């Protein structure tokens, strides 16, 4: 290509003039347009982590179970007895806002490829979703499209979606978040890496043909939205889950041979990123022959081929002499396969087109030599006033029962049954518990007796409001809550992946939020013994200058030695004792209650003592494994009253049944502060449990042994939730409000939403 490189062309490629000057310095000349395109995607935030890398290096990334940490397609941890788990979480936010079905679907496809590229068979997926105000005209459209895309792709792949969370807030009106998680299992001694090792080895393309979809998707994901957002639809990839299924099976068959030296998913920045990253990890060069790439569209240029983000494609470095073996297996699975390059020892990345070199670049500046910024940081200027807000000025509600009903109808708190009904969570029968609880529990079924009975727990979560008010503390809460959820099912947390969603890093207050959240995640992971083994950063989540809440999503994995010794959230037996592991402080700063009922998003998030957190988790984990408990449920959004209601309602059968066997509870809560604050405050490190009377003494002794406080509250029974001196509401009424929250959004039932409180936008939302 001979197009002149003007400042306008440089800007269109997402590079600053200073960065372009650095490109010229590395090359000692002007780049051509194809080379500029390569630098554009490799130096994008999405690929280079240029604003975040200096902070990410502070994460704890090693531990006794870590087999592969950050830097590869997915992290890998040791499950024992020769088995390992590969897992990762990744964002597809920008594409999902532009085209929700395909954006979400290809997000699932991409994270599945990241996992099976490591040599693992995916066995479970999860997701964390954020949408705007429930009454916003685009919220229902995005919710329906994203959920359909996730379900459509995952269901076709035969990988169950077993866990997730969905939250709503006005800050996501112009920028939804779609964070996808996948976990797979593999032999601990057969991990495949994305490396272009072995000079002379062939580089092979396998999978679907290359088209023009997704060109500059990585660059688009590294810029904020504006009024022209709808024009960016061509940068959204189009997925084919049936092709991905063939690619998965072909790769797993290839991994059983000695043909694979290295393998890399063609994800963001497509052929360019996969080939450059493989060369960079090996310290080698590559010669690529673009005229050999299988194409599905005529007239594609080298620029388009290199930057296409067509889905369901892999780049494989084969052992020399094993090309026919690779061809045979790929042909068997009806995949395109071609030799498209060779590994060289030159340290240069060269692209050829019909005998002519169209790009000749050094590898290092594209990888480790990419720009790294220590951007200016300053606390958000709104925080002093928000922290100074006098919570005692909040009026007390006239009827705590009505308040609870309104909170349960809030889409963030309401049942997500409509969502997980769109997902095939029972495929392969790996799920040991139904979705909707604290953490998913997945059976490990390998056919090997050594693995029989083992299970994996999965939890995902974040709290953007906490992270705005105190990024360091809010991020710690995200880690602690995921670990607490895993403890509720009897699991031991072992490792973390993350998806760090933030606004424009060029704004000092956003960069400060990012750095503080990273510091908080690191501190909590060190305290809880959960190293970070993989992750993703998504910046520029802004529309016309309005950024999202800082949302560092955590995906945590835990191990269960005996999957039959787990626990669910629901109260089960009349007469069971109800107790709270933890304390009652009535901390409402940053709470759903304060936002929903009083239009305020202010104060400080609840205090968090990580030593106390560990004691609470250890108490419940050991109690579950000893078989002492009938139920265990994390106390978080909406506080104690919401947790009690959920435990009563989760006893029921799915919506639509003629009779729902709800079960009630009668409790007496000590009130060290205002009743509404104690009932709806979101104090940290609390788990609500129930148990047979005969287990109570042993449970109290266990809690004392672990150093965790326990408060006996009451008993399970009846058909009403009664909190003595505060509220008494039939469980059927609670369940009706709880189950209608999300369907009301989909009906665009603004009148109902306003009446129930679910669409009440805060009068003073966070800046």
UniProtKB/Swiss-Prot annotation:
It comes from Anaeromyxobacter sp. (strain Fw109-5). ATP binds at residues 49, 88, 498, 535. Substrate binds at residues 91-94, 113, 237, 309-311, 538. Part of the phosphoribosylformylglycinamidine synthase complex involved in the purines biosynthetic pathway. Catalyzes the ATP-dependent conversion of formylglycinamide ribonucleotide (FGAR) and glutamine to yield formylglycinamidine ribonucleotide (FGAM) and glutamate. The FGAM synthase complex is composed of three subunits. PurQ produces an ammonia molecule by converting glutamine to glutamate. PurL transfers the ammonia molecule to FGAR to form FGAM in an ATP-dependent manner. This is Phosphoribosylformylglycinamidine synthase subunit PurL. Its EC number is 6.3.5.3. It is found in: Cytoplasm. GO terms for molecular function: ATP binding; magnesium ion binding; phosphoribosylformylglycinamidine synthase activity. Mg(2+) 1 binds at residues 90, 536. The keyword RNA-binding does not apply. Keywords: ATP-binding, Cytoplasm, Ligase, Magnesium, Metal-binding, Nucleotide-binding, Purine biosynthesis. The active site is at 46, 92 (proton acceptor). Belongs to the FGAMS family. One of its GO terms (cellular component) is cytoplasm. Monomer. Part of the FGAM synthase complex composed of 1 PurL, 1 PurQ and 2 PurS subunits. Mg(2+) 2 binds at residues 114, 265. HAMAP family: PurL_2. Pathway: Purine metabolism; IMP biosynthesis via de novo pathway; 5-amino-1-(5-phospho-D-ribosyl)imidazole from N(2)-formyl-N(1)-(5-phospho-D-ribosyl)glycinamide: step 1/2. It catalyses: N(2)-formyl-N(1)-(5-phospho-beta-D-ribosyl)glycinamide + L-glutamine + ATP + H2O = 2-formamido-N(1)-(5-O-phospho-beta-D-ribosyl)acetamidine + L-glutamate + ADP + phosphate + H(+). It holds the Pfam family AIRS_C. NCBIfam families: FGAM_synth_II, PRK01213.1. GO terms for biological process: 'de novo' IMP biosynthetic process.
């Amino acid at each position: 290509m001979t197009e002149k490189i003007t400042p306008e062309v440089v800007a269109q490629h997402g590079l600053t003039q200073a960065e372009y000057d650095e490109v010229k310095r590395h090359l000692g000349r002007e780049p051509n347009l194809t080379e500029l395109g390569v630098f554009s995607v490799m130096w994008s935030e999405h690929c280079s982590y240029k604003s975040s890398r200096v902070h990410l290096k502070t994460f704890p990334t090693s531990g006794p179970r870590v087999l592969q940490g950050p830097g590869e397609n997915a992290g890998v941890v040791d499950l024992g007895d020769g088995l390992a788990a590969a897992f990762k979480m990744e964002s597809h936010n920008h594409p999902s806002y532009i085209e929700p079905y395909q954006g979400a679907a290809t997000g699932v496809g991409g994270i599945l490829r990241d996992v099976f590229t490591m040599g693992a068979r995916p066995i479970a997926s999860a997701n964390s979703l954020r949408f705007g105000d429930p009454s916003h005209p685009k919220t229902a459209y995005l919710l329906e499209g994203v959920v359909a895309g996730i379900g459509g792709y995952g269901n076709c792949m035969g990988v169950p979606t077993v866990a997730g969370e969905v939250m709503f807030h006005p800050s996501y009106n112009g920028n939804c978040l779609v964070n996808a998680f996948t976990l797979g299992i593999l032999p601990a001694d057969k991990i495949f890496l994305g490396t272009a090792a072995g000079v002379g080895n062939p580089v092979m393309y396998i999978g679907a043909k290359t088209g023009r979809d997704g060109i500059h998707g990585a660059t688009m994901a590294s810029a904020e939205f504006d009024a022209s957002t709808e024009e960016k639809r061509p940068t959204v990839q189009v997925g084919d889950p049936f092709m991905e299924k063939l690619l998965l099976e072909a790769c797993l068959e290839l991994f059983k041979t000695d043909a694979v030296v290295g393998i890399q998913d063609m994800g963001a920045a497509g052929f360019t990123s996969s080939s450059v990253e493989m060369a960079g990890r090996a310290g080698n060069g590559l010669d690529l022959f673009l005229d050999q790439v299988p194409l599905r569209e005529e007239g594609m240029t080298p620029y388009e081929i290199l930057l296409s983000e067509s889905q369901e494609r892999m780049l494989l470095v084969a052992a020399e002499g094993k090309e026919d073996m690779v061809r045979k297996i790929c042909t068997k699975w009806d995949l395109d396969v071609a030799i498209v390059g060779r590994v060289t020892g030159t340290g240069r990345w060269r692209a050829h087109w019909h005998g002519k070199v169209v790009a000749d670049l050094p590898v290092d500046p594209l990888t480790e030599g990419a720009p790294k910024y220590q951007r200016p940081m300053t606390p958000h200027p709104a925080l002093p006033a928000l922290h100074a807000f006098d919570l005692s000025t909040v009026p007390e509600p006239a009827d705590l029962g009505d308040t609870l009903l309104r909170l349960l109808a809030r889409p963030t708190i309401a049942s997500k049954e409509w969502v997980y009904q769109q997902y095939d969570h029972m495929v392969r029968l790996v799920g040991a518990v139904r979705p909707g609880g604290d953490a998913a529990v997945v059976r490990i079924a390998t056919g090997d007796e050594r693995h029989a009975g083992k299970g994996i727990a999965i939890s995902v979560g974040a709290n953007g409001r906490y992270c705005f008010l105190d990024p360091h503390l809010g991020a710690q809460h995200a880690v602690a809550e995921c670990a607490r959820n895993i403890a509720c099912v009897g699991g031991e947390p072992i490792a973390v992946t993350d998806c760090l969603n933030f606004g424009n890093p060029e704004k000092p207050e956003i960069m400060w939020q990012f750095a503080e959240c990273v510091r908080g995640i690191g501190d909590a992971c060190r305290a809880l013994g959960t190293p970070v083994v993989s992750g993703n950063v998504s910046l520029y989540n802004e529309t016309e200058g309005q950024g999202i809440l800082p949302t560092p999503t955590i995906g945590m994995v835990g191990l269960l030695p005996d999957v039959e010794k787990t626990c669910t959230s629901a109260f089960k037996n009349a007469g069971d004792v109800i107790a709270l592991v933890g304390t009652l402080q009535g901390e409402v700063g940053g709470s759903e209650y304060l936002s929903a009922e009083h239009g305020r998003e202010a104060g400080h998030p609840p205090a968090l003592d990580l030593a106390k957190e560990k004691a609470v988790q250890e108490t419940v984990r050991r109690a579950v494994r000893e078989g002492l408990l009938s139920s265990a449920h994390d106390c978080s959004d909406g506080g104690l009253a919401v947790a009690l209601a959920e435990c009563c309602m989760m006893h029921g059968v799915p919506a639509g049944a003629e009779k729902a066997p709800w079960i009630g509870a009668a409790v007496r809560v000590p009130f060290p502060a205002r009743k509404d604050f104690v009932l709806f405050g979101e104090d940290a490190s609390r788990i609500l449990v129930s148990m047979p009377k005969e287990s109570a003494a042993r449970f109290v002794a266990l809690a004392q042994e672990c150093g965790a406080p326990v408060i006996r509250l009451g008993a399970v029974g009846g058909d009403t939730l009664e909190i003595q001196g505060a509220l008494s509401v039939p469980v059927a009424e609670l369940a009706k409000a709880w189950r209608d929250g999300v369907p009301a959004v989909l009906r665009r039932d603004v009148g109902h939403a306003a009446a129930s409180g679910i669409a009440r936008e805060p009068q003073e939302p966070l800046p």
